[in-house]
Amino acid sequence: MRKGSIRLIAAASVIALAITGCSSSSDEAANTDTEFEIFTWWASGGEAAGLGALVDLYKAQNPETEFINASVAGGAGVNAKAVLESRMAAGDAPDSFQAHAGLEVIASYAAQGKLEDLTALYQSEGWDKSFPADLIKQTTLDGKIYSVPVNIHRANVLWWNPATAAKAGITKAPETLDEMFADLEKFKKAGVKTPMVLAGGEGSWAMAHLLDYVLVASMGPEKFEGLFSGSTSWTGPEVAEALKVYQRLLSYGDKGKNSFGWGEAGAAITKGTGGFFIMGDWASAQWQNEGAVLGTDYTFAPGPGTVGIYQWLSDTFTLPVGAKNRNAALAWLKLSGSKEGQDAFNPLKGSIAARTDSDLSLYDDYLKSAAADWAKDRLVGSTAHGVTADNKFMASMNAAVGKYISGGAKDNAGLAKDLAAAQAAVVK
């Protein structure tokens, strides 16, 4: 990866030294456990299909272990995280659970003493050579590694229906915010029901996802990252300008559908009733699972204003302290981090492998393009999906966005103040 792509504290050589020189509590043992419970929010569509492929491999490798799928539906884990927190507080941790790389894993779980150190597992599996060093750092605290990345998703993707765009006179993907607004006007004049597809349900996470993208597109990567380092103010002019862009985008949405979840809202693209949709690349897997065809029913481009920028997130699996079926969990983690596991999971999930040696012949044209961009673009961590923010900030961001929208998307200054307060509460 490139300088400036993901902000790091230590170099790759330090990570390699830690992996080869540290012991950990994650010592290997044969899986003699009779049960294994995995906790995710992958309950439907392409997400469930991807998980299912991984589960099938696990069952084949561990035929004596009963697999318990404890998935809790809800995009971005808004429901699952609340259930997980209650379970862990009650001493009822699942054997492994899904968490995003970055501050979600590091601050929300590892720093709270809720996860076992997996450094020895990385050593035994050779993952220091299989995963990008910068990505390993996003699961590392005080030299210890706490989760296993299974994929890479791209958050800043623009989706549209080619036939709908052609009818509106749109012949190429917009590359700038100004070009996107010009195209939204074309959709509007052509009678497209929803020029900008919005999804305000499921705790407003998809609207926070849209804001996350707008901040990067409007401010640029450095100013955006400064929001979390302290060099950019949430109440400063850069955010104020970005919120004007956000407010303007919302004006092109269908206000009657603001309560829709992302899947229900996004169906407007493949049905031809929607114009543009900013959503992560899991949308492609969802649509393909519903029978849509890439290139015919929908197509893609980097979000306008973010060409050459890859706003990323990574799903990872953990080993909670106190897991009842620890050996079964270790078997799951080994599979999740393996080439076989990742190449079975990711083509169906709509993501690329976290590993650097995946077989790209198994991936569709969108995912091949994502892999190429991941290797060359400027990488920026997603806030809405846990890279640059912990669970506390994400919940506050979702609440602030929900409040803003329910108030008619009018109080930009109030939204900025709420986001500043959320950040201040985290860094205290």
Where are the predicted features?
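Extracytoplasmic/periplasmic substrate-binding proteins
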Residues: 41, 55, 244-328
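Short, low-complexity disordered leader/linker segments with a strong preference
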Residues: 1-37, 60, 421-428
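C-terminal capping/gating helix-and-loop segments adjacent to ligand/active sites or protein-protein/ligand interfaces
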Residues: 351-354, 370-424
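Glycine-centered hinge/linker elements that transmit conformational signals in sensory
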Residues: 184, 228-258
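A structural signal for short loop-to-beta-strand junctions that line the ligand-binding cleft
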Residues: 94-95, 125-163, 194-198, 299-300, ...
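Short, solvent-exposed loop/beta-turn-alpha elements that line the ligand-binding surface or hinge
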Residues: 119-131, 175, 196, 200-201, ...
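Periplasmic solute-binding protein
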Residues: 106-111, 135-172, 181, 200-226, ...
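Extracytoplasmic "Venus flytrap"/periplasmic binding protein-like
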Residues: 57-131, 138, 166-169, 175, ...
